[in-house]
């Protein structure tokens, strides 16, 4: 079974990071991807889905952070690759670059692992991500923090050279994603700086993957879905000769229009979550504007 023919919403790997990928988004939105038609029967087990995506130097999994089923799938992906001896490393958006478990033994305690990764439980509940991390540690595989350290974010905001890391089309797509991702509530003057942070984070994750690469094995990156699209995310910063596979996890009964083959290699659906107004939550958490 290939990634193109598997009945679990896989789409044939397409043009990767090239500019034409951006141009295809409009067409994908209108026509969709025929391989994304929900199957009549249950999808194959996770090990079979993973096998359909191999070989790969890097396997990027874009999740919805508040979907427990996504973290369960991620753990199963780690276990499947580890069981085959094909897991090189696990990289995480949820920990900062420079933190890793390389000095820990497979029998390390969860407390030791959390300390080694500088884990921030307030931002990333260990209850959700601990099983994913420990599956790698217990398999004797290193876990790397991949996110841009918070201390470097301020400098990234003013680093205009980051704009040139993406093509004009991809940069605009990233700016639009930042704008809508913040519920159109950001002043336009903040779109550029916030986009640079996103680019810097994607580049940091890509650098971590490259450093963890091991011939014949796969490095897995677990991140939010916003970091994984081929057209503007982490894949944009990876060498073109590397075999990169991207999986989008979607908590929905049907994939979105932007989940076509130019963006992801496979889309795995999980049960929809209860309705939630994320923009209302975001706006409620923002400080009130000062009175004029």
Label the predicted regions.
Residues 89-95, 246-250:
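Short internal beta-strands
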């Amino acid at each position: 079974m290939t990634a193109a023919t598997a009945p679990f919403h896989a789409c044939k790997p397409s043009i990767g990071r090239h500019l034409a990928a951006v141009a295809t988004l409009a067409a994908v939105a209108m026509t969709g991807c025929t391989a994304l038609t929900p199957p009549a029967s249950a999808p194959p087990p996770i090990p079979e889905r993973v096998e359909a995506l191999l070989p790969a130097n890097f396997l990027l999994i874009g999740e919805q952070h508040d979907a427990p089923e996504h973290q369960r799938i991620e753990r199963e992906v780690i276990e499947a690759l580890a069981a085959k001896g094909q897991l090189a490393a696990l990289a995480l958006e949820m920990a900062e670059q420079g933190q890793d478990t390389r000095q820990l033994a497979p029998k390390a305690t969860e407390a030791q692992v959390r300390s080694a990764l500088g884990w921030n439980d307030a931002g990333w509940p260990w209850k959700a991500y601990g099983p994913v991390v420990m599956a790698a540690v217990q398999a004797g595989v290193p876990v790397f923090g991949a996110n841009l350290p918070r201390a470097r974010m301020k400098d990234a905001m003013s680093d205009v050279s980051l704009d040139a890391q993406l093509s004009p089309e991809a940069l605009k797509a990233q700016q639009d994603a930042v704008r809508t991702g913040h519920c159109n509530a950001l002043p336009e003057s903040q779109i550029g700086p916030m986009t640079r942070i996103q680019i810097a984070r994607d580049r940091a994750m890509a650098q971590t993957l490259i450093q963890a690469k091991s011939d014949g094995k796969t490095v897995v990156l677990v991140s939010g879905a916003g970091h994984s699209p081929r057209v503007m995310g982490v894949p944009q910063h990876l060498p073109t000769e590397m075999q990169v596979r991207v999986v989008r996890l979607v908590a929905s009964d049907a994939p979105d229009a932007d989940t076509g083959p130019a963006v992801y290699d496979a889309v795995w659906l999980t049960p929809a979550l209860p309705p939630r107004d994320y923009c209302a939550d975001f706006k409620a958490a923002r400080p009130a504007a000062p009175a004029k």
